[in-house]
């Protein structure tokens, strides 16, 4: 199955993905469900795969001194070989940073002339 799932999952999946704050039972349940989803559908956190020891965060609360990586690209292993890059782009206008994903196409698709011609 070919899956690309991205978004704000509202929890840090690993200790490396969070500084500050506290852990709750509710968060542990959500983390467990996301990890089960990844196992059941053979999904990889591609950013973590590319940056196994890096601490970089996608959400921050400066008043509480908490930073977490809450935003993920989860990609099926079948498609993960097509990932050429993933990244986190710091934002100055939001408490969330953008996450990027670059995939290499398996085949060249020739572009048509478009509707203006």
Model-derived segments and spans:
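Surface polyanion/phosphate-binding segment centered on an Asp-His-Pro turn
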Residues: 2-4, 66-68, 73, 77-117
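Metal-dependent phosphoesterases centered on the DNase I-like endonuclease/exonuclease/phosphatase
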Residues: 1-75
């Amino acid at each position: 199955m070919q899956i690309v799932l991205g978004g704000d999952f509202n929890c840090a999946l690993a200790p490396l993905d969070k500084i500050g704050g506290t852990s709750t039972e509710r968060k542990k349940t959500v983390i467990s469900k996301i990890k089960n989803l990844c196992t059941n559908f053979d999904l990889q956190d591609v950013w973590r795969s590319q940056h196994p020891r890096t601490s970089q965060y996608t959400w921050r609360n400066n008043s509480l001194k908490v930073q977490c990586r809450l935003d993920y690209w989860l990609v099926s292993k079948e498609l993960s070989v097509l990932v050429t890059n993933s990244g986190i782009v710091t934002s100055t206008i939001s408490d969330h940073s953008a996450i990027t994903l670059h995939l290499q196409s398996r085949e060249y698709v020739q572009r048509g002339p478009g509707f203006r011609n």
